[in-house]
Amino acid sequence: MSDLNPSRAVTCYQMEKLARAIEAFRNSENAYSKEIPAQVIATFLYVASHDDCNKIDMERELELSSASGSRNTDWLSDQHRLGKPGLGLIVKYRDRTNRRRQILQLTAKGRQLANTMKQILYGEQTI
């Protein structure tokens, strides 16, 4: 690296890659995605790594309340709270065998973002 400013020199390339992957998430189309909470990113990463998971399992694994899980998945779906547009990264639908259970699945846009993040972190794609 030829940067002459030592405060800007990368000292850990793995963490720098992680920062770029998170920045890819924050650079979504919605203006308010810049201020996205870590819980929402964690929820997205859980769904990306457990596609077709149920919401209760996600909440249990991430130690979220049902209300937090709903807020996070609303933010990631097409419709955010109070009529605001969501990020459109996941869809929620009812389980056919248990109507009380919600299933979470990546949209094409969500798969594309997950692939971008994997490419940044590992140089690989395809979800």
Where are these regions (language model features)?
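N-terminal helix-turn-helix DNA-binding core of bacterial DNA-binding proteins
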Residues: 27-65
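Residues in the recognition helix of alpha-helical DNA-binding motifs
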Residues: 72
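Basic, amphipathic "hinge/linker" alpha-helix immediately C-terminal to the N-terminal HTH DNA-binding motif
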Residues: 96-114
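N-terminal leader segment of winged-helix/HTH proteins
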Residues: 1-38
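Extended hydrophobic secondary-structure segments that form protein cores and membrane-embedded regions
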Residues: 44, 90-94, 105
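A short, conserved structural fragment
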Residues: 77-94
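Amphipathic alpha-helical dimerization/coiled-coil segments
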Residues: 5-6, 24-28, 111-127
